[in-house]
């Protein structure tokens, strides 16, 4: 057996339409799939441009609550301009800090799921 990659990370959200608007229109993720199996089951899957790992915006289920995911990391090549652009789109980001061969800022989605925006300044993510 060999696990070869992380395919999809489920993000629990209280309102899939609001979350879709945030991830697609504010963060710029690409919508891959939006399929409603029934009124209770909807699969909303997005991906950052150029990435392989996707996210799925899911209604919370047993053991999962909206806003309960923390420490998700996305990478940028220019944290300063990305920080300014996202701030201009209404995202509340922390100040940029530098440590461990990288520059970081944090933010939350509308449900409180926590993200880290990183720009590698060394071999940290090589």
Question: Predicted segments — roles?
Answer:
Residues 55-58, 115-116:
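Conserved beta-strand in the GNAT
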Residues 1-4, 8-11, 32-35, 42, ...:
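Vicinal oxygen chelate
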Residues 49-54, 63-64, 79-81:
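Short, charged/polar surface micro-motifs in flexible loops or helix N-caps
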Residues 15, 78, 109:
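Acidic di-acidic motifs
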Residues 6-8, 67-72:
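Eukaryotic phosphotyrosine signaling hubs
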């Amino acid at each position: 057996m060999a696990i070869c990659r992380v395919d999809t990370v489920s993000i629990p959200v209280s309102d899939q339409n609001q979350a879709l608007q945030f991830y697609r229109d504010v963060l710029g993720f690409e919508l891959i799939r939006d399929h409603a199996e029934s009124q209770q089951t909807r699969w909303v899957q997005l991906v950052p441009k150029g990435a392989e790992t996707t996210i799925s915006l899911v209604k919370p289920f047993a053991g999962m609550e909206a806003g309960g995911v923390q420490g998700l990391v996305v990478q940028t090549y220019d944290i300063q301009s990305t920080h300014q652009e996202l701030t201009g789109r209404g995202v509340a980001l922390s100040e940029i800090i530098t440590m461990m061969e990288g520059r970081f800022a944090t933010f939350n989605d509308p449900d409180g799921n926590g993200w880290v925006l990183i720009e590698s300044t060394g071999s940290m993510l090589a």
